[in-house]
């Protein structure tokens, strides 16, 4: 009985997610800038009305920040967008950013900034995996509306290697 309990404890410990989420080693923000399509995501409250055609556009700014425009189509056909700004918080890799969609006047408040960590990235920048260090948020993005099965599997593998539950992903139509 003691052996069974010890074996069970070891198995549960080994099956847990990695202690920390790891980003990619380096991101070229000029190559990363541009338009991305959301291929899959964890369900979240701020995208609850998005029914399809979910996109993100990133544009480098002279001050080093990144202009962010997120857009999606609702089920009634109307388009909504959210404009924000991102800033690099890890200058070594440029893979950890903070993003805010709150008005600039509130930017001094830490809670208006959300984590945007690039945890997977194709060598040719055709797909990216973005998550948060608490593993509550996850997105798979691509330069085209669809990813082929092999590329999607590589993106999911990057998320899974960081302890994200691939079963929670919802794919866009």
Predicted regions and their residues:
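A beta-rich soluble binding module of mature secreted/lumenal proteins
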Residues: 2-3, 10-173
